[in-house]
Amino acid sequence: MKKFNKRDQPLYPIIIIHKKRKVIPTTKEPTAAQLEQRVKFNVATKFHAHAKEMLPVIICKKKSLDYKTRFTKMIHHCGFTGSYPDYEVDYSQLQLTTGNLSELFKSVSRDSSGVLTVTWEYERWMGGADDTVNLFVYNSTAKRSYVFGKIALRHQEEMSVEIPGSDKDDVLHIWVFFKSPDHKHISYSKYFSLEG
């Protein structure tokens, strides 16, 4: 009698068939909590569409993939202000950048023509004179965003920039931060808000 040997048997492919489950649409009305969650998600997603334009300026060398994922999570977890259905992202809780460079930003002001002026402190002993100043502005009234990369150097201690299409009554949310010339280091962002 011939012995059964596994090695002599031909191998056959194993086919697994997944039957697609039919989803039956529900006739139930969404709960109040579900409606709130949908509005919050929609608000966060719309802001993310604006904020992601800043990623090329924010990202340091060799950190792009990690930061893109983390950035999305940060926006969705920074909280909301207002009440249903008029929620807004709690912009003050969003730390746009984190890093080891000192930031020392002092103030942001706006004149009647819509020009923003940002000031900061600089001392020679601190080093980093050629760190670049970068700015992200979100106009929550007009739902517009503006990215300004490398608009000044740290040693200049002040810079001004015009926000196109901005009305003096618009609410502006501003994040400003430093980045090293070699794109390897970045500072914590500083948040400012200008009410209309």
Regions found by a protein language model. Name each.
Residues 1-102:
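Long, polar/Ser/Thr-enriched low-complexity segments
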Residues 63-196:
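Charged linear interaction tracts used for macromolecular binding and regulation
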